[in-house]
């Protein structure tokens, strides 16, 4: 198997490597809604909430004052709420944020004119990051539309590296078939880069980096087998997907962008009522979140196994699946169980001690 970084590898600059929660990345999901219903998706796309633009702008400015300098966007499908993207990008550019990427399925547009209008709005707003295109078997076959997206983005942004690709699979050398199909439409080749330790899609007009995501069978994908693969995850203190403030459409703030992040147990604040400093303090004191960034996910695993050696059906190399399993099943100390599809997206249930714990985070009234 080819060794490649996944979304757990971060190239974000870190001022100091103190083992604590010290976010250096801000990401907004303006809407849960999406034009696709992917079978592996962990986002509750049924929920109608949208982030209010003035409140998001205030939080963006507060994060900048706190010292956070990198900005990204996710969803749902973020391009279904283009006015949010453009307003936040414009203010982010004015403040001097470094843009990461806008994660998109790339097939949200009605026609080429609609696509070009929205992308031109982004360029005028000052967006200088990447368009992170999700291309894998779970998103369905939309090769022609994806090719249109890549070509239009290249022309409008005048950058050969404007697009990056993400794909979810069990292993980095699996699940590449839709990408090979896209490469054919773009007159491109897909090959391994020894320098970057990942695949590249390259054409005369485009240079696209491929990012592998370790598929976590959670939420809608819980029925997929193979999560307990017999190997324990390598400890990384969640430095890649974590050390972030991820704001969902309800205004709730999460400490990571992992597959388990929409669970209520990982809420560390709300932008409608909390400052950035207050959210960071709460995360550090949080009985689960704080421990992950201080001691690692392996410390939570070891604590559970010391209490019950038969607590898990096996070992898993997938960090996000392990986190989701522990939280929904109520195996972790200090937080309740429930949530996700196990709890029909809402609600809580007692943890292993029989306690139903309220961490103290309330949503917008």
Residue ranges and their predicted role:
Residues 1-27, 230-231:
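N-terminal [4Fe-4S]-dependent radical SAM core
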Residues 17-53, 66:
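Canonical Radical SAM [4Fe-4S] cluster-binding loop centered on the CxxxCxxC motif
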Residues 26, 53-73, 81-192:
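Radical SAM/AdoMet-radical enzyme domain recognition
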Residues 31, 35, 235, 317-320:
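Residues immediately within or flanking Cys/His clusters that coordinate Zn2+
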Residues 36-40, 44, 77-80, 101-102:
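Active-site-proximal cofactor/substrate-binding loop regions of enzyme domains
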Residues 41, 45-48, 245, 263, ...:
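Cys/His-rich zinc-coordinating "finger/knuckle" motifs
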Residues 161-259, 297-317:
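A C-terminal junction/extension of Radical SAM enzymes
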Residues 258-365:
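Flexible mid-to-C-terminal extensions adjoining Fe-S/redox cofactors in radical SAM and related proteins
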């Amino acid at each position: 198997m080819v060794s490649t970084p996944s979304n757990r590898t971060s190239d974000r600059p870190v001022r100091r490597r103190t083992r604590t929660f010290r976010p250096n990345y801000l990401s907004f999901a303006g809407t849960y809604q999406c034009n696709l219903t992917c079978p592996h998706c962990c986002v509750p796309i049924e929920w109608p909430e949208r982030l209010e633009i003035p409140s998001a702008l205030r939080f963006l400015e507060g994060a900048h004052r706190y010292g956070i300098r990198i900005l990204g966007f996710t969803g749902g499908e973020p391009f279904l709420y283009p006015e949010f993207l453009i307003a936040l990008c414009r203010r982010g550019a004015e403040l001097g944020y470094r843009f990461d990427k806008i994660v998109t399925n790339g097939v949200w547009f009605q026609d080429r004119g609609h696509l070009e209008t929205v992308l031109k709005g982004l360029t005028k707003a000052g967006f200088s990051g990447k368009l992170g295109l999700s291309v894998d078997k779970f998103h369905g076959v939309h090769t022609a539309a994806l090719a249109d997206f890549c070509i239009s983005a290249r022309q409008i942004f005048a950058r050969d590296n404007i697009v990056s690709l993400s794909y979810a699979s069990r292993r980095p050398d699996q699940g590449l078939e839709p990408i090979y199909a896209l490469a054919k439409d773009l007159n491109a080749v897909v090959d391994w880069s020894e320098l970057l330790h990942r695949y590249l899609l390259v054409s005369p007009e485009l240079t696209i980096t491929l990012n592998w995501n370790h598929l976590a069978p959670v939420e809608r994908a819980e029925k997929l087998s193979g999560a307990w693969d017999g190997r324990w995850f390598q400890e990384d203190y969640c430095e890649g997907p974590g050390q972030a403030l991820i704001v969902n459409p309800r205004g709730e703030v999460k400490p990571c962008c992992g597959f388990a992040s929409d669970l209520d147990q990982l809420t560390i604040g709300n932008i409608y009522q909390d400052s950035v400093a207050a959210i960071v303090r709460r995360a550090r004191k949080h009985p689960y979140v704080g421990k992950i960034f201080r001691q690692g996910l392996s410390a939570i695993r070891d604590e559970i196994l010391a209490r019950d050696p038969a607590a898990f059906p096996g070992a898993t190399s997938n960090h996000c699946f392990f986190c989701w399993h522990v939280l929904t099943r109520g195996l972790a100390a200090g937080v309740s169980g429930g949530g996700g599809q196990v709890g029909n997206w809402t609600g809580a249930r007692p943890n292993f001690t029989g306690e139903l714990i309220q961490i103290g985070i309330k949503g917008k009234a």
